[in-house]
């Protein structure tokens, strides 16, 4: 059975890159009737926080991503990681390196001066017992390094990139697998080692991650072999790029799923767009889909090698498509909490709020638009420049005045639209203006501007709460 995993580090909130990796893993697992698993890589003791773990889990659930088993907590497996390092030491495949930071800095400076790439020169690979004893007598601690032969031939068939081949000499020298500690101890195990041990223990069959991990894959394959563990199949998805074609980073602004949510993007649109960041839909498939629909079509032969540029216009279009497909009841379920949080009073009868959602729905791109566009229905808006100009135009005040007189004589309750048309026509005629002037002036009086949703429905909603007449009267004061 296919078993894939997402292995986020809880050192921050759920990042868009992690979310895209989660989506690809989940899609592949579902396409193969396999399992999607979670591992929380919390071994960075200083930066890992429980609230970030909670944020990641909640963010994945919001996107519609579920997992088959309880998350594995990496920090609870340190004993197994040290056992693996101990096994490497016993086999002679790892050793203690006593080089201190000053010596390593001098080594790197010399390499830089001679235009050589930075790498550890394996200087302590073959220390004698006497040399080790001498370093220990100096009180030096040691890291533990894994031997990487320069002539090692590392290759694998990547599901996205085809045959990949690396030389051991390109991996920067013998790799540190445990942090510095006294010579009789094993320090904190490091990323490449713990990932191999944990993936094997979780019986992961496929590792799907970003292309920035390709060099790590070469190192990890050597560790799988050294530890006698079966290696998984690898797939390296393209990076997410900004508009300039560079890797998307915090400097580009919004990168956290939290931020996308607060801006008013829906989970369905974000999950949809994450799928399109690097995956091409098959012929005949629409670009708007659910994760479940995408899983039925997902395969790595449609995952691109080139980086995927983040396109705000495409995301906005997808989000609008999602919102426009919702019923008024669905929209109200999401907008009601936003309206209440804003301090607005919603009538107990859902009918009025549902009518408002039906009116606003077709014009929404983001959920937050449902705040901006709903505001004039809950509180009297200020007059904007175009609205003020309209109300100061010839005949506008007379038209509003005649409409007020008509409403005071025959109150419109917001239900009979034929009555509304008659009231507007009569007021325009009495003021000696065209009906278009009457309509523009009414919109300016009610909304404070000349742009907005259907005018009669707008008037109807305000009339049902008796908010129309005070706004009309304001225009004459």
UniProtKB/Swiss-Prot annotation:
ATP binds at residue 250. One of its GO terms (molecular function) is tRNA binding. GO terms for cellular component: cytosol. InterPro entries: aa-tRNA-synth_I_cd-bd, aa-tRNA-synth_I_codon-bd_sub2, aa-tRNA-synth_I_CS, aa_tRNA-synth_I_cd-bd_sf, Glu-tRNA-ligase_bac/mito, Glu-tRNA-synth_I_codon-bd_sub1, Glu/Gln-tRNA-synth, Glu/Gln-tRNA-synth_Ib_cat-dom. It catalyses: tRNA(Glu) + L-glutamate + ATP = L-glutamyl-tRNA(Glu) + AMP + diphosphate. Its EC number is 6.1.1.17. Disulfide bonds: none annotated. GO terms for biological process: glutamyl-tRNA aminoacylation. A motif ('KMSKS' region) lies at residues 247-251. It is found in: Cytoplasm. A motif ('HIGH' region) lies at residues 8-18. The keyword Aminoacyl-tRNA synthetase applies. HAMAP family: Glu_tRNA_synth_type1. Belongs to the class-I aminoacyl-tRNA synthetase family. Glutamate--tRNA ligase type 1 subfamily. NCBIfam families: gltX_bact (TIGR00464), PRK05710.1-4 (NF004315). Monomer. PANTHER family: GLUTAMATE--TRNA LIGASE (PTHR43311), GLUTAMATE--TRNA LIGASE, MITOCHONDRIAL-RELATED (PTHR43311:SF2). Catalyzes the attachment of glutamate to tRNA(Glu) in a two-step reaction: glutamate is first activated by ATP to form Glu-AMP and then transferred to the acceptor end of tRNA(Glu). This is Glutamate--tRNA ligase. It comes from Synechococcus sp. (strain CC9902). The lineage of its organism: Bacteria, Bacillati, Cyanobacteriota, Cyanophyceae, Synechococcales.
């Amino acid at each position: 059975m296919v078993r894939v995993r997402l292995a986020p580090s809880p050192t921050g909130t759920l990042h868009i890159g992690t979310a895209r990796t989660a989506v690809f893993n989940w899609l592949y697992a579902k396409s193969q009737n396999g399992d999607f698993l979670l591992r929380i890589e919390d071994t960075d003791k200083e930066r890992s926080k429980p609230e970030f773990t909670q944020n990641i889990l909640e963010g994945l659930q919001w996107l519609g991503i579920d997992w088959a088993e309880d998350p594995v907590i990496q920090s609870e497996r340190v004993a197994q990681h040290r056992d693996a390092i101990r096994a490497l030491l016993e086999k002679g495949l790892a050793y203690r390196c006593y080089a201190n930071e000053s010596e390593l800095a001098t080594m790197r400076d010399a390499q830089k001066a001679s235009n050589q790439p930075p790498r550890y020169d394996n200087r302590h690979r073959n220390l004698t017992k006497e040399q080790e004893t001498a370093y220990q007598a100096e009180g030096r601690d040691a890291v533990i390094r894994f031997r990487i032969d320069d002539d090692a031939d590392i290759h694998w068939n990547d599901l996205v990139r085809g045959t990949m081949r690396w030389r051991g000499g390109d991996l920067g020298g013998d790799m540190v697998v445990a942090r510095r500690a006294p010579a009789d101890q094993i320090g904190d195990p490091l990323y490449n080692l713990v990932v191999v041990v944990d993936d094997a223990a979780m019986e992961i069959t496929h590792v799907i991650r970003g292309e920035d991990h390709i060099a790590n894959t070469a190192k990890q394959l050597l560790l799988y072999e050294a530890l006698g563990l079966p290696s998984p199949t690898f797939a390296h998805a393209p990076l997410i790029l900004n508009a300039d074609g560079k890797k998307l980073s915090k400097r580009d602004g919004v990168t956290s799923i939290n931020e996308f949510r607060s801006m008013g993007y829906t989970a369905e649109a974000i999950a949809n767009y994450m799928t399109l960041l690097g995956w091409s839909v098959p012929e005949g498939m629409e670009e708007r889909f659910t994760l479940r629909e995408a899983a039925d079509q997902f395969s790595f032969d449609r995952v691109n090698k080139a980086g995927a540029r983040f396109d705000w216009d495409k995301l906005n279009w997808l989000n609008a498509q999602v919102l426009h497909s919702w019923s008024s009841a669905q929209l109200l379920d999401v907008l009601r909490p936003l309206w209440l949080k804003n301090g607005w009073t919603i009538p107990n009868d859902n009918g009025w709020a549902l009518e408002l959602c039906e009116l606003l729905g077709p014009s929404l791109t983001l959920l937050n638009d449902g705040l901006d566009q709903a505001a004039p229905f809950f509180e009297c808006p200020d007059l904007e420049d175009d609205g003020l100009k309209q109300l100061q135009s010839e005949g506008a005040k007379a038209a509003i005045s005649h409409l007020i007189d008509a409403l005071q004589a025959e109150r419109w309750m917001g239900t009979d639209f034929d009555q509304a048309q008659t009231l507007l026509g009569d007021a325009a005629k009495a003021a000696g203006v065209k009906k278009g002037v009457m309509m523009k002036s009414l919109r300016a009086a009610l909304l404070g501007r000349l742009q907005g949703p259907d005018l009669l429905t707008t008037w109807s909603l305000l009339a049902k709460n008796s908010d129309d007449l005070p706004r009309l009267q304001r225009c004459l004061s």
